[in-house]
């Protein structure tokens, strides 16, 4: 039988598929899941650019890449190139998406019962705001350059 001192030092057992486990899972993986989603969107845009040659699909591909890597136009890509610019854009954008995923996880963890479905709703709201900002910035840039 355990003594009272031994009971205090033992870690509480967590039910593998319980409420605490889900909240812990959201806290640990929310940011990385958001980065993964952004990477998939970026790779989709790159595939569209690589597989098509029309102006319409080129615009769709560039918008998809810019949504996945929102710092891309901010560092001057694709007008100016260079490994440093690509590194800054990719690492900075990954940090932004990680932060958005962690923010979504933190807000969802406040609920009594948190799930990935709740995280995706919260993340969708923040991701939509970020994507709309990117699209509006690209529209302003295209208008100022005379492309629209």
Protein language model regions, located:
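Extracytoplasmic/cell-surface-exposed regions of Actinobacterial cell-envelope-associated
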Residues: 32, 56, 98, 136-138
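Alpha-helical membrane-anchoring segments
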Residues: 27-36, 119-129
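Cytoplasmic membrane-interface segments at the C-terminal ends of transmembrane helices
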Residues: 20-27, 95-123
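Actinobacteria-biased recognition of intrinsically disordered, low-complexity terminal regions
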Residues: 1-36, 145-148
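Alpha-helical transmembrane spans of integral membrane proteins, capturing the lipid-embedded, hydrophobic core
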Residues: 35-39, 86, 90-98, 126-134
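Membrane-associated alpha-helix detector
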Residues: 19-85
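Short alpha-helical packing/oligomerization segments
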Residues: 68-108
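Juxtamembrane boundary at the C-terminal end of a transmembrane helix
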Residues: 133-148
């Amino acid at each position: 039988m355990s003594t009272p001192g031994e009971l205090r030092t033992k870690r509480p057992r967590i039910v593998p598929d319980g409420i605490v486990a889900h909240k812990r899972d959201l806290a640990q993986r929310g940011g990385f899941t958001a980065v993964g989603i952004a990477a998939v969107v970026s790779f989709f845009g790159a595939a569209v650019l690589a597989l098509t040659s029309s102006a319409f699909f080129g615009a769709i591909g560039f918008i998809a890449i810019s949504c996945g890597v929102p710092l891309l136009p901010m560092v001057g890509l694709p007008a100016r190139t260079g490994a440093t610019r690509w590194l800054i854009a990719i690492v900075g954008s990954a940090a932004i998406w990680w932060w958005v995923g962690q923010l979504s996880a933190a807000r969802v963890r406040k609920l009594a019962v948190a799930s990935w479905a709740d995280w995706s709703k919260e993340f969708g709201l923040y991701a939509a705001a970020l994507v709309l900002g990117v699209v509006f910035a690209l529209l302003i840039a295209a208008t100022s350059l005379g492309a629209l």
